Amino acid sequence: DNDERMGYCQILLERGMEHGMDPADLWFDPLFLVVKGMQDKQMEVLEAIKMFSDMELNSTGGLSNNSNGMPKHIRPIMDSALVAMAMMNGLTSAIVNPCDLRLMETIKSCDIFKNNTLYADSYLEI
């Protein structure tokens, strides 16, 4: 749960800073969970990302874990939906399949809406 996630986050943050690390150099994993069998936990993951973002901490993780075990034609849809929601909650980066065209288009489009990238008609080609 998020109390446990944030407890570990606080411990790691404090230990890193004790050793001279800048919080900006630390990356926290919200632990993306498999939807199959853990559907009720998905919003907690997004809330954890928001908590990291509110603390101005970086977040990253294995995004495609959410769709593990699903049919191949469904995985890109689920991964794209989750990355959009995670980015809007402040996800800094993610471990993703760069060959998944739908996912990459979603990430690039979210970057436009978040004003991380200047829109151009050719933005999908970059």
Regions found by a protein language model. Give the residues of each.
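Catalytic alpha/beta core domains of metabolic enzymes, predominantly
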Residues: 1-121, 126
